[in-house]
Amino acid sequence: KTINCNKILTEVYEHPNYSDFQKYLINEQFVLAQKNREYNCEIQKIDLKPYQSLIKKLGLAGIQFFESKNDIKNKSDHYRKLEKLEWSIDQDIPIPKGIKWTRDSFDRFLEKKKFFEQKCYGTEIIAVKDGKYIGMTSLTVFKRSEPNKAFTETLGVLKNYRRQGIATALKIKAIETLIIKGIKEIRTDNEINNPMYKINEKLGFYPVPSSLEYLKTID
């Protein structure tokens, strides 16, 4: 099958184990397109009590938090709302220049979401106000290879609802859920200029080797 593609994007880490591969990419005319801060956290060491007042405050403002798979997935319009929310959030996630987001068909979105729920679900927390999905975070757990570690796939809040602490609350609710499930660590990343990393540092996430995204345009 022919794929209409003219760019190759790959990733390495700023770690000696990747030095040879990084040299290879540079020799092959790959260019550094984006650098990401990488963070890890032993979540069972986090003191979650100071954040309960924030969650209570948001609740009084009409903002509720639900776990997608276990609380609201059976609502008739759940996946339509979730697809719309994810697509909106994706537009604000920094990606290398020259790369564009492609919106899947709803059927393809649903297929991938079902796979996530069945095969590698860590948790997915949705923030809801007046029935509208306004923010979310999603984390994957690879149950065979790293069953005690979750990887953040996305975290975002719609623009009109930012600066209220919703992103922090989403992270706290996700951590609470993962601790109950026996997860011990979370790995996450942020583009180097994305201020979201400040939330991670405040919670006790610590830096690990950064990731580097290399891009090559092909004829």
Q: What are these language model-derived features?
A:
Residues L54-S105:
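Short amphipathic alpha-helix that is part of the acyltransferase structural core
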Residues D90-K149, E153-V157:
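A conserved beta-strand-loop-helix scaffold within acyl/acetyltransferase catalytic domains
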